Amino acid sequence: MLIYRPRERTPHVLKFASEPSTGEMEAILGGQFKNVPGFLSVEHEGIVHRCVALCAENGSDKKPPLNVAATILWDLALRRDLGIGLIGRNGTRADDLAGPVAIFFAN
């Protein structure tokens, strides 16, 4: 699993012997979490992997810091898999990711 945190360009790589529990994922992501729609692939170490990405629900009034690296990876996944992106030519974003983001490679 790759963990991208705000203000960090490179992921933390976490290895699990088995699938992490909901409680472990909530601890990593800072609360209840959801699937990131359209984040279906990620390039890591020169290889494009099918994936599932998770982020915190952000139900509170306090929004966590912008996660630039994860937002760029999400934009690239959308462009690669669906032909559309989040970031316009003028730099405006249709959406973004905030707080930590977990990415699992799909088998």
Where are these regions (language model features)?
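Detector for the mature cores of small, proteolytically processed
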Residues: 1-107
